[in-house]
Design a protein with these regions (language model features):
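Secretory-pathway/luminal and periplasmic proteins that interact with or process carbohydrate-rich
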Residues: 52-57, 73, 148-159
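A structural signal for short, hydrophobic/glycine-enriched beta-strand patches
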Residues: 38, 61-91
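Short, flexible helix-coil linker/hinge segments at the edges of structured domains or between repeats
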Residues: 161-172
Length: 172
């Protein structure tokens, strides 16, 4: 019996001391600029993924208006969006912060890919037959960037009027 306890303690110690390292690089960050059209396509796919992620257009940004207006109601048992349905939310709610962060992540990713596509086209790194595809990707990226800005303005900026014309809307 002592043998089993010894091996169990040894196995537990081995598992404990062989845990994963916290010194990892973020997997969604690029350290080098895009060097070809495939890189721009990868940036485009990344922008789509960020835009459709649940804290932004995958859930929160699309449903927030429904909950705040009373079209939908949050469940008190799950707590999901309940504070918005009952008008007891604050400006520090996690959903609001996530919408802000992922909106700007989508804008940043789109801008990075647009700038890379433009520099590749200007430098001649993209061939003439690839240019229509590059322009197609660029158009999609501009659309995603505009959509993300539109949602951020709708949720976080003041309504435009002559009285607040000098007040900034969102950070551009």
């Amino acid at each position: 019996m002592k043998k089993y306890k010894f091996f169990a303690a040894l196995a537990a110690a081995a598992i404990t001391f062989s845990s994963c390292s916290m010194d990892t690089e973020p997997y969604d960050q690029t350290t080098t600029p895009y060097t070809n059209l495939k890189g721009v396509e990868t940036g485009l796919n990344g922008a789509y993924q960020i835009l459709a992620y649940y804290p932004f257009l995958g859930n929160y940004a699309q449903t927030m208006g429904d909950f705040i207006s009373g079209v939908s109601t949050g469940s008190s048992s799950s707590g999901h969006f309940y504070s918005y349905s009952s008008f007891t939310f604050s400006d520090t709610e996690q959903e609001i912060e996530d919408m802000w962060n992922y909106g700007y992540k989508a804008i940043s990713q789109s801008t990075e890919a647009i700038n890379s596509a433009n520099s590749l086209i200007a430098s001649g790194a993209i061939s003439e037959e690839e240019k229509p595809t590059a322009y197609l990707y660029e158009g999609q990226l501009y659309t995603m960037k505009a959509l993300a800005n539109w949602y951020l303005v709708n949720y976080f900026a003041l309504p435009y009027s002559a009285a607040n014309a000098s007040t900034p809307g969102i950070i551009v």
